[in-house]
Amino acid sequence: MVVGFWWLERHAFQDSYESDSGTAQTIVFPEAYIPSFEGGELIIHDHFQLSYAEQYEQAAWVAYTLDKAHLTGDIRKRPYYIMDPMVSTGSADWRNFKGSGYDRGHLCPAGDRKFSETAYNQTFYTSNISPQDRQFNAGIWNELEQQVRRWARKYGKLYIITGGVLGDGLPTIGTDYVAVPEAYYQVVIRGEGEETRAIGFLIPNTNTDLQPEAFLISLDDLEALTGLDFFPELPEQAQ
């Protein structure tokens, strides 16, 4: 009985993946590149940040920095999905996804945060997941994540903003009515100042045999679709 209770206390009662010491090194995302989203709650974790949209029970955007030094490939024990303790209204419960037919799709990929246990575990907050078609998640979305990692190894530091396209009338899952996006976007930026370059993708939340480059989109068009203002200080020629 003692062993059983210890297991429950350690696992079932886990309510935070924040650093106990408070000394974890924070990976900074440039403030100038943070998109605007009216009504979202800004949440800043050690290794990514997001704007939580309570009406859709998920992030409107997740932003993170990716450097080739982050791609360590360390083996990490997969933690439980838990609610984000920093979301004041409470992020969606992971059980909303049970029996829904949708994957718990990461926005900031767990595979990009294996360089530390805290970084890896924080990606399992439910504020960082969104309902994704299983073939989409395992297929083209994974291919895009792999491509971004190749770019990070080639070019060094990248800044990524990603999320589902949210809006009225979307289907929902679970008792929290988690919205199911019809498409997901990703914006990748490298360089700073006049050397800044950005590329955008918009991919339907369904299976496809096409490659990510088939879904390139300008930032202007992506802003019109999402209602977000990406990189407000980014030079126009970079977009």
Language model segments and positions:
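Domain-level detector for secreted/extracellular nuclease and nuclease-toxin modules, and
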Residues: 1-239
